Swiss-Prot record:
GO annotations of cellular component type: cytosolic large ribosomal subunit; plastid
Pfam family, one: Ribosomal_L14
UniProt xrefs under PANTHER family: 50S/60S RIBOSOMAL PROTEIN L14/L23 (PTHR11761), LARGE RIBOSOMAL SUBUNIT PROTEIN UL14M (PTHR11761:SF3)
Taxonomy of the source species: Eukaryota, Viridiplantae, Chlorophyta, core chlorophytes, Trebouxiophyceae
Keyword Ribonucleoprotein: yes
Keywords: Plastid, Ribonucleoprotein, Ribosomal protein, RNA-binding, rRNA-binding
GO BP terms: translation
SMART domains given in the database record: Ribosomal_L14 (SM01374)
Protein name in the entry: Large ribosomal subunit protein uL14c
InterPro entries membership: Ribosomal_uL14 (IPR000218), Ribosomal_uL14_bac-type (IPR005745), Ribosomal_uL14_CS (IPR019972), Ribosomal_uL14_sf (IPR036853)
Family membership noted in the UniProt record: Belongs to the universal ribosomal protein uL14 family.
Subunit annotation: Part of the 50S ribosomal subunit.
Highest taxon above the source species: Eukaryota
Length: 122
């Protein structure tokens, strides 16, 4: 579950390494955000010479959480890190490549543009 002040890894090639959640925009509950939810975040760490600058305010979609994901078929899924993908206001990814697995809960949330870039879907 992602809430304000949570540090997330960035799972795309925009140049940002870490972001910190400021606000949950479209969440599944009042408490926090889960996989497929949209957040507003600030960039904390970047790579050198990137399009995204440090302390820039961005929107992101959560793609991996350390909190367990419970599926209807009885399967439980848990990742080692909290990760997000930077998106535009129209929910299109800013990067051209994604890293790591993407759960299919993102496609259920209507984020097909992110699913199309995913290397593999769990």
């Amino acid at each position: 579950m992602i809430q304000a002040q949570t540090i997330l890894q960035v799972a795309d090639n925009t140049g940002a390494k870490e972001i910190m959640c400021i606000r949950v925009l479209r969440g599944s509950s009042k408490k926090g955000a889960r996989v497929g939810d949209i957040i507003v975040a600030v960039v904390k760490k970047t790579k050198k010479q990137t399009s995204v600058k440090k302390s820039e305010i961005v929107r992101a979609v959560i793609v991996r959480t350390r909190t367990t994901i419970h599926r209807a078929n009885g399967m439980h899924l848990k990742f080692n890190e909290n990760a997000a993908v930077l998106v535009t206001k129209e929910l299109h990814p800013k990067g051209t490549r994604l890293f790591g697995p993407i759960p299919y809960e993102c496609s259920e949330a209507g984020l097909n543009s992110i699913i199309s870039l995913a290397p593999y879907i769990i």
